[in-house]
Curated annotation (Swiss-Prot):
Gene name in the database record: rpoA
Catalytic activity of the protein: RNA(n) + a ribonucleoside 5'-triphosphate = RNA(n+1) + diphosphate
GO MF terms, alphabetically ordered: DNA binding; DNA-directed RNA polymerase activity; protein dimerization activity
Function: DNA-dependent RNA polymerase catalyzes the transcription of DNA into RNA using the four ribonucleoside triphosphates as substrates.
SMART domains (UniProt xref): RPOLD (SM00662)
Glycoprotein keyword on record: no
Enzyme class: transferase
Protein name: DNA-directed RNA polymerase subunit alpha
NCBIfam families membership: PRK05182.1-2, PRK05182.2-5, rpoA
Source organism (scientific name): Cellvibrio japonicus (strain Ueda107) (Pseudomonas fluorescens subsp. cellulosa)
GO biological process: DNA-templated transcription
Taxonomy, superkingdom: Bacteria
UniProt-listed HAMAP family: RNApol_bact_RpoA
Record's subunit section: Homodimer. The RNAP catalytic core consists of 2 alpha, 1 beta, 1 beta' and 1 omega subunit. When a sigma factor is associated with the core the holoenzyme is formed, which can initiate transcription.
Amino acid sequence: MQTAVNEFLTPRHIDVSEITPTRARVVLEPLERGFGHTLGNALRRILLSSMAGCAIVEAEIDGVLHEYSAIEGVREDVIEILLNLKGVAVVMHGKDSTVLTLSKKGPGVVTAGDIQVDHDVEIKNPDHVIANITGNTELKMRLTIARGRGYQPADSRRRDDDESRAIGRLQLDASFSPVKRLAYSVESARVEQRTDLDKLVLDLETNGTIDPEEAIRRAATILQQQLAVFVDLEGEKQSAPEQKEEAIDPILLRPVDDLELTVRSANCLKAENIYYIGDLIQRTEVELLKTPNLGKKSLTEIKDVLASRGLSLGMRLENWPPASLKND
């Protein structure tokens, strides 16, 4: 099996070309035929939908009750402002969520750089335009930043009791993935006399919160961790849970001699291998009457003695005989 695995080519060359600070071209070769699309598609899906990042998920704008409002002295309506807020590239260090403020008096352009941040938060695209103030209006807002993965629509964060949510807290559809665009192609590669090999080319662009090369490295790590479980399909052998023996009434473990039956009745029971009270109560009247030398008088005696102890014939016991009797 190991020999068959070793026969596969593994990539020997990887070339990373930086096109811009947020865009890179990665070439990986040689790959066995078909593996270009196999790896390319897997990495693409992880990079676009499974990468963790930060995004603005909620906004409170002074004087705005809902997203269909307009702000006097601001060129954009509220929906446009919310769309622009989704384009802010933000990084948080050591936090899962935080609240930032923005305050800008016009006239002028409101950019991501106007957001007031603390030492744990970075805005990677400070020139990103959020709104344009055309008058002397002052635009104030509170922005909630959260950490997440992939794409999260606003509806998925709303609580069941939406009516209790404060008016004016506007929810944003959040795209946490730091990858803005990814395309891959598979070209032909050659190694010595083999010409049927693949070359994988990845063209990746991020929002600036992560280096393109680091993004690919993280995606490959995620893929590796998910596939590692298949390397050994046996996994850890789970031992069968020990079945705890149900507690048995101690009186059932006592010998039939303790019932102080007549010698005739006691001997008849022992002849039928009935040694314990637990053995006896599981027999029916019909079964006992078939016992040699045990008549109705002896049967009545047995029933009366059992009744005095709260027992009767024909009872059913689970897990009988118990292990303690089997080992005797």
